[in-house]
From Swiss-Prot:
Similarity annotation: Belongs to the cytochrome c oxidase subunit 3 family.
Protein name: Cytochrome c oxidase subunit 3
TM ranges: 16-34, 41-66, 73-105, 129-152, 156-183, 191-223, 233-256
Function: Component of the cytochrome c oxidase, the last enzyme in the mitochondrial electron transport chain which drives oxidative phosphorylation. The respiratory chain contains 3 multisubunit complexes succinate dehydrogenase (complex II, CII), ubiquinol-cytochrome c oxidoreductase (cytochrome b-c1 complex, complex III, CIII) and cytochrome c oxidase (complex IV, CIV), that cooperate to transfer electrons derived from NADH and succinate to molecular oxygen, creating an electrochemical gradient over the inner membrane that drives transmembrane transport and the ATP synthase.
Length: 261
């Protein structure tokens, strides 16, 4: 092995970006096949490919950062910038959905009956399951902060407890959201209200599932003593992402559930 005179990580060639792109192609193509031909085969293949890619890519990053020491302070600084820019891009992603919602609701067209919610739509009560979901995500924001402080103080037991609570709250939120979708009186095909509601809240739900997976990986790493009080960017990135998911939900609740109803 040649001697390295700089602090940067020269990444080895990896197949995972290619397999990740392939799984994205299979998933999007699979959704089209599912919607038009009621065939779920491509979706299953795409999901399997994506899960395998996630596992192996995460495994490589954990190996490089924890066991090989490639994640120097300089590399961690670059990773932090990358995570911040990723969250900024996600903000603009959700901004498009809010724009579509307000564009449709502030000046309803005659086709919608000139009112919002459109004629025939019975919106969900914001003081029932949506309010419970809000309290769940706010509580999870508190518990993830508790986990972060416990990690920085070297309190392993409390960190595991707090992170486990956050994961359980995330799973509970997902179950409640799924039951709410199942019991709602309108669908994604019910005009602009249905499409904006289900796309905005559905993508948020997907982000909750991704964030919960991220936190589960962090919990498994904590069990294996991968984090220290000074070297834990993987957990820090997951916590930032989770706080972002919390804030997006507050805007969704106020805009779509409360004001929009």
């Amino acid at each position: 092995m040649t001697h390295q005179t700089h602090a940067y990580h020269m990444v080895n060639p990896s197949p995972w970006p290619l397999t990740g792109a392939l799984s994205a192609l299979l998933l999007t193509s699979g959704l089209i096949m599912w919607f038009h031909f009621n065939s779920f085969l491509l979706v299953i293949i795409g999901l399997t490919c994506m899960l395998l890619t996630m596992y192996q890519w995460w495994r490589d990053i954990v190996r490089e950062g924890t066991f090989q020491g490639h994640h120097t302070p300089v590399v961690q600084k670059g990773l932090r910038y990358g995570m911040v820019l990723f969250i900024v891009s996600e903000v603009f992603f959700f901004l498009g959905f809010f724009w579509a919602f307000y564009h449709s609701s502030l000046a309803p067209t005659p086709e919608l009956g000139g009112c919002w919610p459109p004629t025939g739509i019975h919106p969900l009560n914001p003081l029932e399951v949506p309010l419970l979901n809000t309290s769940i995500l706010l509580a999870s924001g508190v518990s993830i902060t508790w986990a972060h402080h416990s990690l920085m103080e070297g309190n392993r037991k409390q960190m595991i407890q707090a992170l486990s609570i956050t994961i359980l709250l995330g799973i509970y939120f997902t179950i409640l959201q799924a039951s709410e979708y199942y019991e709602s009186s309108f669908t994604i095909s019910d005009g602009v209200y249905g499409s904006t509601f289900f796309v905005a809240t559905g993508f948020h739900g997907l982000h909750v599932i991704i964030g919960t997976t991220f936190l589960i990986v962090c919990l498994l790493r904590q069990f294996n003593f991968h984090f220290t009080s000074t070297h834990h960017f993987g957990f820090e990135a997951a916590a930032w992402y989770w706080h972002f998911v919390d804030v997006v939900w507050l805007f969704l609740y106020v805009s779509i559930y409360w004001w929009g109803s």
